[in-house]
Amino acid sequence: MVGELYRFITDFGVIEGYIIKEEPNYYLIKLKNGYNIGIKKSQIKEMENLNEKIKVGQFPKRKPKGIGNLGFIYTGGTIGSKVDYLTGGVSAIMDIEELLAIADLPYDIKIIDSPFVKFSEDLNPKDWVEIVKSIERTYKKGAEGIIVAHGTDTMHFSSAYAYYALENPIPIAFTGAQRSSDRASTDAVINLFASSIYANSNIGEVAIVMHETINDDTAIAIRGISARKMHSTRRDAFKSINEEPLARIYYPSGKLEIINKKYRKRSDKEMVAKPYLDTKGALIWVYPGFDPSILEYYRNYRGIIIAGTGMGHTSKELIPMLKELSKDLFIGITTQCIYGITHPYVYSRGRELSKFATYLQGTPEKNYVKLLYVLGKESDLDGIKKEMKRLP
């Protein structure tokens, strides 16, 4: 009975769906539109077996389109998860072919790679390196554009690292989902579709491609170092911080509209991966009552990003410790406001800090990722300072 299609004549109408669980007093039914409902047995007048069976959560295989030469890298996350209908939790991992089948992409995926499968909250900086190496492998196998399926919680960290670590990139779209891919409400279909359009475009940049609004008609491509997850659950969780998105992709037409005229075009030069990394860097958010002695822990680090208040400030109590640390390690100042700029000369506190710290633009997360990249590239403090200022 479980997994079979039934027609139920009930007190409130006729319903067709697959039985995915039977309890003493009710059936749990999966409707053909993907939603699940419960029907009390006492409300069923008649039920008919329609002689069709499924495995719960099973998807058809993808069909070749005959155009395109894209690569697909799977790293885990909600986009590749299924709901376990027995527990109600999101846990099981889908087969990659199932994931690609649900989106019915307009271009063919020719190369598939998966360096690891993790939820993004479990990723560490060394995983960013593995993603970049996977991108490099996929490119060398002939991919002309690449989609990276990734958990959304820390996707903006990974996209920022890939942005710095790849020279002359082909179009690379990081994407994910806020709803698991077997749900009727999933955002994975539009996100994967839009990512394939971006990956086949003439934009030579690493980007995050996700829903533009809560509706299913457009997605946006955001530069990898400018994207940030700004909502925990909404489909349009990712926003472009302090600059316009690169492009808008329309669904289902597939039209790509350039928004940011300062985009980098796809290059004829070979893409080169330079995955520099040193994890002896930290991101520290200051707050009222922050104890300066906390900074003692980081004395043996090589760099610190301070997410300051307002335009990049800290309390006066932190200045002596930060000044002392700056003799041996890089101190960068950014703003925890997320939107807006830092500036060292508007307030006197900024002038004090700028005597030994470097003011940086962009999000705290982007500057933390940039720091770890630069620490892996440069060996001395002067070189670190110059490179942190030079890179966007």
Curated annotation (Swiss-Prot):
Pfam families the record matches: Asparaginase, Asparaginase_C
Record GO biological process: amino acid metabolic process; regulation of translational fidelity; translation
Active-site residues from the entry: T78, T152, D153, K229
EC assignment: 6.3.5.-
Cystine connections: none
Keywords annotated in UniProt: ATP-binding, Ligase, Nucleotide-binding, Protein biosynthesis
Known catalytic reactions: L-glutamyl-tRNA(Gln) + L-glutamine + ATP + H2O = L-glutaminyl-tRNA(Gln) + L-glutamate + ADP + phosphate + H(+)
GO molecular function: asparaginase activity; ATP binding; glutaminyl-tRNA synthase (glutamine-hydrolyzing) activity
Domain (Asparaginase/glutaminase) ranges: 68-391
SUPFAM superfamilies: GatD N-terminal domain-like (SSF141300), Glutaminase/Asparaginase (SSF53774)
Assembly information from the UniProt record: Heterodimer of GatD and GatE.
Family under the similarity heading: Belongs to the asparaginase 1 family. GatD subfamily.
Xref: PANTHER family: 60 KDA LYSOPHOSPHOLIPASE, L-ASPARAGINASE
Summary of the function given for this chain in its UniProt record: Allows the formation of correctly charged Gln-tRNA(Gln) through the transamidation of misacylated Glu-tRNA(Gln) in organisms which lack glutaminyl-tRNA synthetase. The reaction takes place in the presence of glutamine and ATP through an activated gamma-phospho-Glu-tRNA(Gln). The GatDE system is specific for glutamate and does not act on aspartate.
NCBIfam families for the chain: asnASE_I, gatD_arch, PRK04183.1
Protein name per UniProt: Glutamyl-tRNA(Gln) amidotransferase subunit D
Gene transcribed to yield this protein: gatD
